[in-house]
Curated annotation (Swiss-Prot):
<protein>
    <recommendedName>
        <fullName>RecBCD enzyme subunit RecC</fullName>
    </recommendedName>
</protein>
<keyword id="KW-0238">DNA-binding</keyword>
<dbReference type="InterPro" id="IPR013986">
    <property type="entry name" value="DExx_box_DNA_helicase_dom_sf"/>
</dbReference>
<dbReference type="GO" id="GO:0008854">
    <property type="term" value="F:exodeoxyribonuclease V activity"/>
</dbReference>
<dbReference type="InterPro" id="IPR027417">
    <property type="entry name" value="P-loop_NTPase"/>
</dbReference>
<keyword id="KW-0347">Helicase</keyword>
<keyword id="KW-0378">Hydrolase</keyword>
<keyword id="KW-0269">Exonuclease</keyword>
<dbReference type="GO" id="GO:0003678">
    <property type="term" value="F:DNA helicase activity"/>
</dbReference>
<comment type="subunit">
    <text>Heterotrimer of RecB, RecC and RecD. All subunits contribute to DNA-binding.</text>
</comment>
<dbReference type="GO" id="GO:0005524">
    <property type="term" value="F:ATP binding"/>
</dbReference>
<dbReference type="GO" id="GO:0009338">
    <property type="term" value="C:exodeoxyribonuclease V complex"/>
</dbReference>
<keyword id="KW-0547">Nucleotide-binding</keyword>
<dbReference type="GO" id="GO:0006310">
    <property type="term" value="P:DNA recombination"/>
</dbReference>
<keyword id="KW-0227">DNA damage</keyword>
<keyword id="KW-0540">Nuclease</keyword>
<dbReference type="GO" id="GO:0000724">
    <property type="term" value="P:double-strand break repair via homologous recombination"/>
</dbReference>
Length: 1121
């Protein structure tokens, strides 16, 4: 008997299954009951629930339909192999061998053109093509077995006739393409069958076995090996071929199919079935055996008889009924149609076990209307939160908002636990880092929510697997410095080469200093001094020779690796040697036996085997051996290129099951998969974006099924719509849906998934007052709006962001200029260099010394491209080094710069060297007569009025750049003039004025100017120094807003109107000109003090007090050409 149980709730179906086990125990207590399921997750849930119901769940087997049916073939048909010779993987490898043989034939011109025009290697493209064709053949075997038989008979025109009959209006060009695709696919299939027969005596595929097994079942006298009964649970749809097999078996044993039907009314296709037949169908009521229920309600029947009601696939909607069910339910509707259609010729016992939805909440009303095939306005309560839609600015914000939502739910409902929550996304790998970042850390006093991740790829979740696959894909790598250093972040790899975590900062410093940028070999495309080989030669040479000892065999010792650091340099060299050998190996194609050796050696060469890694290394080794054995079985002897083997191993390793984490007593994060939507109190859907869901799958142009539709065909977007419907119906108390609704860059609105839009339109139809609106969340976690109690349930629990949220940039409390009187230390002495640094940039000094905040405006990453131009820092370094060299040593210096990888390669380097040489020689003329510089110590006391008392401050340190008998301060900068260059010589000169007689005014020399600083009297100099020291002391408690980073003289003015504009310029970058100052940018972004004229006046007054004397007497400036 074929028994179909129709219910809208899995809990009820589970209850029926449990009662069957109790009332009808198996005759043999040792025989396993067979329960077909769609996924291991459904089996896991069912086992747990049956154990709760009966106290135990044992001796149950949960195969997938395809594997179970193949097992039936193997047990009952003698010629059937235990392993399917026509599985997708085997067909792919065979096709890789066969396709090249046929490429010269006229029918195969589309394949020939595809392979020849590929930018990738032809073999890799052949591998991809073979995989696509194998997948297509596998689909034909299940959904179009009649085409397979037509090809085997050589009757290709049968297929094109079927397509033309269903689509008579196809244009001639497309139909010709379909005919061509049919011919080459038929020829390839016939060759595939012959190839399988050469290895296996009987090349029997699933379609042929299907017919043979049906014939066997039709023979009542023939012996058969069948289970005593079969249960089918939690499968939304079965391929027609599988259903036919199970229906045929039902003449021998009982088949119990549990169909999770979202609607208790008939909502399948009506036009293809006779109305009188449908009207006669009855349903038996579970627990009400004396009552039968007709297939149609009275309203439906009346409308049908009056021709008001038509449900067809072509229209994809119901003229009367529930629009959501019509739009999303195609997969279930087709299967329902097939089940009802087959009741006419298959003895079927249909049982209805629908559960009424008792809740009056928005979610309950929605589920109830779907159950009853209704379409009426919903009653939306003002504070109903059973179904909420959330718009965020990014995936990270989606997870943060979800975290707050769940914490709020747990607060409101103490009975709710983490295991009652499932969170499903279109692609769990995309969200994994955000989930781990938000749910994996503790936010102040807020407790962590336990969570588990299912379905993420092993390459995304295991660092050893990820790095192993990275190594396999190094064939086309340019070995950039950053890419290689990332490998050393992997503990198992780092330890294999005896490099510790503490060594990594030094390794990065060496890589930077040795000029490594990209490339493995030094002699790659000419001499590449930025390669790993060149850099490592410098490190190794540096162990014995310092840079000053000159070039040895086109290399230069690296000073920082000199002496005791030689062991680390040797370990790095060992790592490089292994990478270089691997790269060379990957350039060649190899047999599978050789690849087995290479892949195994890769594990031992690059990864340390210890307690943490041994299991995963063993697993990878197992997969390598399985692949090798499989290809040997198929007699695949072609040599494989590295990109193909990398792809194959990736697929092997990513198939690792981790779905057992699905029901682990925690919040379940997983991918939205068929029948993953088992009942949960809280169902959350993330990433419901327009571009991401329903997921798109571009059809192959040679897929013939797309031109010939049959009920039961699987279409990815239709499947996703049904998954969304299942998720909505699986929520028992709450359903939460979120998407990225605004751009994080410009805040422009972005559309949600069309399914979300349809849901919102359906809920709000006919609503006048209370409509369901999308809750829009702030872009940042620290927005003040997140911490306000409101009716939209958006309050944040992340207390770590509360201080920032409470920060008000418009209030006085936000000002950097507030005093910091806590833990004030008494200063009795000031070092000269510290005082100069303070005066040169008082804002930066405050951030770094008082707040401990350091802004870096340069990219810390190592460049990964050839340097056709010199960076500003390299240019400055070269110029200043050459200033101290004699002209006859310039050539050696430039040669060293080339070997160090500083100068651009080839002619570019020569041009740069010539330009630098000319500029340096010109500047050397300006400083040629200075003689040798001297330095002098400074140590004296200053009397400073500060904090309402007179304090004696010791000023001490050293002054350099003193020239001549009179120790004149002369500073030079090999750069264009900037006002701030005057500050150091100015302070030195002030000290000379205070501490010695007849101090000579200081001088500044730059590329474009030579200027003498203004002479001043001792008392004036003392007063000026007292201003600097007093403000230095004051900077302990208050930032000193004196702009020194651009033209200081712009702020020694009496006109206040242009000051705001000049301040704003400090925060702006100007092409190749000055860059924005990060410290001033931060100050001006977080203070409103300069909106008041009195504060601008204060800034001008202080700037004039600091530099009025220095920049007032412009007549002392001299310009030299």
């Amino acid at each position: 008997m074929f028994i179909v149980y129709y219910s809208n709730q899995l809990e009820k179906q589970k209850e029926i299954l449990s009662s069957l086990f109790k009332s009808l125990p198996p005759e043999d207590p040792f025989q396993q009951d067979i329960i077909l399921v769609q996924s291991p997750n459904m089996a896991q849930w069912l086992q747990i629930e049956l154990a709760k119901e009966t106290g135990i769940s044992a001796n149950l087997k949960f195969p997938m339909p395809a594997s179970f049916i193949w097992q039936l073939y193997a047990q009952n048909l003698p010629a059937t192999a235990l392993e399917n010779p026509f599985d997708k993987d085997s067909m792919m490898w065979r096709l890789m061998r066969l396709i090249p043989i046929f490429l010269e034939k006229e029918n195969f011109s589309p394949l020939r053109n595809y392979l020849s025009s590929s930018p990738h290697s032809e073999q890799y493209k052949l591998y991809q093509l073979s995989s696509k064709i194998a997948d297509l053949f596998d689909q034909y075997l299940v959904y179009r077995p009649e085409w397979i038989f037509a090809w085997e008979k050589g009757e290709d025109e049968q297929i094109t006739d079927q397509i033309q009959k269903q689509q008579p209006n196809l244009n001639a060009t497309l139909f010709a393409q379909i005919q061509g695709n049919t011919k080459w696919q038929g020829e390839l299939w016939r060759a595939l069958v012959v190839d399988v027969k050469s290895d296996v005596n009987e090349a029997t595929h699933r379609a042929a076995l299907h017919n043979q097994f049906l014939a066997l079942l039709a023979d009542k006298k023939a012996p058969k090996k069948l289970p005593s009964r079969i249960f089918i649970f939690g499968i939304p749809a079965l391929p027609t071929a599988y259903l036919n097999i199970l229906q045929a078996i039902s003449s021998e044993v009982d088949i119990h199919l549990f169909f999770n039907n979202p609607c208790q009314e008939y909502w399948g296709d009506i036009s293809d079935l006779r109305l009188d037949y449908l009207r006669s169908r009855q349903r038996y009521q579970f627990n009400k055996q004396d009552e039968n229920q007709p297939l149609f309600s009275e309203d439906q029947l009346s409308q049908l008889e009056n021709a008001q009601f038509d449900v067809t696939y072509q229209k994809e909607n119901l003229q009367l009924g529930n629009p959501l069910l019509a739009a999303w339910g195609k997969m279930g509707r087709d299967f329902l149609y097939i089940l009802v259609r087959d009741e006419e010729h298959i003895p079927t016992y249909p049982v209805n076990a629908y559960q009424e939805i008792e809740s009056n909440s928005l979610l309950g009303q929605l589920q109830s209307q779907i159950l009853h095939l209704e379409n009426k306005p919903l009653n939306i309560a003002k504070n109903d939160r059973t179904l909420t839609l959330h718009s965020c600015h990014s995936a990270m914000r989606e997870v943060e908002v979800l975290h707050d939502y769940l914490l709020d739910l747990f607060n409101q409902d103490p009975s709710l636990t983490p295991k009652d929550v499932v969170v499903m996304v279109a692609d769990i790998n995309q969200y994994t880092p955000y989930i781990q970042a938000v749910f994996g850390q503790k936010n102040g006093d807020v407790p962590q929510i336990p969570f588990s991740l299912s379905d993420n790829k092993l390459s995304e979740s295991d660092v050893l697997v990820s790095s192993y696959l990275t190594l396999l894909r190094l064939k086309e790598s340019n070995f950039s410095a950053e890419d290689v250093l990332v490998l050393l972040d992997i503990p198992a790899m780092r330890e294999r080469f005896n490099i510790s975590l503490a060594d990594l900062p030094l390794v990065r410093e060496w890589v930077t200093d040795s000029g490594i940028r990209f490339g493995l070999q030094k002699n790659q495309d000419g001499i590449n001094f930025n390669s790993w080989q060149a850099g490592l030669e410098r490190m190794i040479l540096g162990y014995a020779m310092r840079e000053e000892q000159g070039i040895w065999q086109d290399s230069l010792g690296l000073n920082s690796s000199y002496g005791l650091k030689g062991e680390l340099a040797g370990n790095l060299s060992h790592f490089f040697t292994a990478l270089s050998a691997l790269h060379e190996t990957l350039q060649q194609a190899h047999s599978i036996e050789k690849w087995q050796e290479i892949l195994t050696a890769l594990l031992s060469d690059f990864f340390v085997r210890n307690e943490d890694t041994s299991d995963m290394i063993f697993y990878i080794q197992e997969k390598i051996n399985e692949l090798a054995e499989h290809l040997k079985t198929l007699h695949f002897n072609e040599e494989l290129q590295a990109e193909v083997i990398a792809d194959v191993i990736t697929m092997q390793l990513e198939d690792a099951p981790n779905s057992l984490k699905f029901l682990a007593g925690k919040v379940n994060f997983c991918t939205l998969l068929p029948m993953r939507s088992v009942p949960f109190k809280v169902v959350c859907l993330l990433g419901m974006n327009d571009a991401d869901y329903p997921r798109t799958q571009t059809p192959n142009s040679f897929d013939l099924m797309q031109y010939h539709y049959q009920k039961g065909d699987r279409v990815r977007r239709d499947d996703d719509r049904y998954l969304f419907l299942e998720a909505l119906l699986a929520a028992r108390d709450y359903c939460y849906i979120s998407y990225v609704g605004r751009s994080i860059t410009d805040n422009q609105p972005k559309e949600p998934s069309v399914l979300v839009s349809q849901l919102l339109d359906y809920i709000n139809q006919g609503q006048k007052e209370n409509v369901l609106t999308v809750i829009e969340h702030p872009m940042t976690a620290f927005s003040p709006d997140n911490f306000k109690n409101n009716e939209k349930f958006t309050r944040s629990f992340a207390t770590k962001w509360l201080p920032i949220a409470q920060f008000d940039a418009s209030s006085n409390n936000s000002e950097f200029a507030v005093t910091m009187t806590e833990n004030l230390e008494k200063i009795e002495e000031v070092e000269l260099d510290a005082l100069v640094s303070f005066v040169e940039n008082p804002v930066k000094f405050f951030f770094e010394k008082q707040l401990g905040v350091y802004f870096r405006d340069k990219d810390e990453r190592i460049a990964d491209s050839e340097n056709f131009t010199l960076s500003g820092l390299d240019n400055y370094s070269l110029n200043n080094d050459l200033i101290y060299l004699d002209e006859q040593n310039f050539a050696d210096y430039f040669r060293q710069a080339e070997v160090k990888g500083v100068l651009p390669r080839a002619e570019f380097g020569k041009v740069y060297a010539e330009n630098i040489r000319d500029n340096v020689l010109e500047f050397k003329k300006k400083i040629a007569d200075l003689g040798e510089a001297k330095h002098a110590s400074v140590d004296f006391n200053l009397s400073v009025d500060w904090q309402n008392e007179n304090q004696k401050i010791r000023l001490f340190g050293y002054m350099d750049a003193l020239f001549g008998d009179d120790s004149q301060v002369i500073h030079w900068h090999f750069a264009k003039y900037k006002d701030r260059y005057c500050i150091r010589p100015w302070i030195y000169y002030l000290i000379q004025c205070v501490t010695q007689e007849n101090a000579v005014p200081a001088k500044l020399i730059t590329q474009d100017k030579v200027l003498e600083l203004p002479p001043i009297e001792r008392e004036v100099a003392l007063a000026q120094l007292q201003i600097y020291v007093k403000d230095y002391l004051q900077s302990q408690i208050e930032i000193q807003l004196v702009p020194t980073v651009r033209n200081i003289s712009d702020f020694i003015v009496s006109d206040e109107n242009s000051v705001s504009e000049k301040l704003q310029e400090l925060t702006e970058s100007n092409g190749f000109g000055p860059k924005a100052d990060p410290y001033w940018s931060r100050v001006l972004a977080q203070t409103s003090r300069f909106k008041q004229p009195e504060n601008i006046a204060k800034l001008l007054k202080q700037t004039k007090a600091w530099f009025g004397l220095l920049f007032a007497q412009k007549k002392t400036r001299k310009t030299q050409s």
